[in-house]
């Protein structure tokens, strides 16, 4: 947990540009997302993210999935261990300028 995430307990952080760590989180849940949406994404690039500190970390990540399409994913991390990731939700048919919100 970074110093930044320690400061926001319970609330949703401001949007931040995606880092390599955020891309890695997204990549780990990609197979499950593709199974749930019945899609194979040609591109899967994390653009930005917000974090909510709960018992673990709740990541809301905006993904560019190619052809001008975006989606938002919600990934819960750290409930049973730091490496434990759970895809807890997703929103399809999003636009580049759609704000990440709690869902």
From Swiss-Prot:
One GO molecular function term of this record is:
cysteine-type endopeptidase inhibitor activity
- Which ranges belong to the motif Secondary area of contact? 52-56
Q: Where is this site: Reactive site?
A: 10
Swiss-Prot/TrEMBL keywords: Cytoplasm, Protease inhibitor, Thiol protease inhibitor
Principal subcellular localisation of the protein = cytoplasm
Task: State the function annotated in the UniProt record.
Answer: This is an intracellular thiol proteinase inhibitor.
Q: Can you say what this protein is called?
A: Stefin-2
Name the InterPro entries on file. Cystatin_dom, Cystatin_sf, Prot_inh_cystat_CS, Prot_inh_stefin
Report the GO terms under cellular component.
Answer: cytoplasm
Report the superkingdom from the record: Eukaryota
Similarity comment: Belongs to the cystatin family.
Compartments reported by the entry: Cytoplasm
Q: Which organism is it from?
A: Mus musculus (Mouse)
């Amino acid at each position: 947990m970074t110093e930044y995430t320690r400061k926001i307990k319970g609330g949703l952080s401001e949007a931040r540009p995606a880092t390599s760590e955020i891309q890695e989180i997204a990549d780990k849940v990609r197979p499950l997302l593709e199974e749930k949406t019945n899609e194979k994404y040609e591109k899967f690039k994390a653009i930005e993210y917000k974090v909510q500190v709960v018992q673990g970390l709740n990541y809301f990540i905006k993904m560019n999935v190619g052809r001008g399409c975006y989606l938002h994913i919600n990934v819960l991390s750290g409930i049973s261990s730091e490496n434990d990731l759970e895809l807890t939700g997703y929103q399809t048919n999003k636009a580049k300028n759609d704000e990440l919100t709690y869902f």
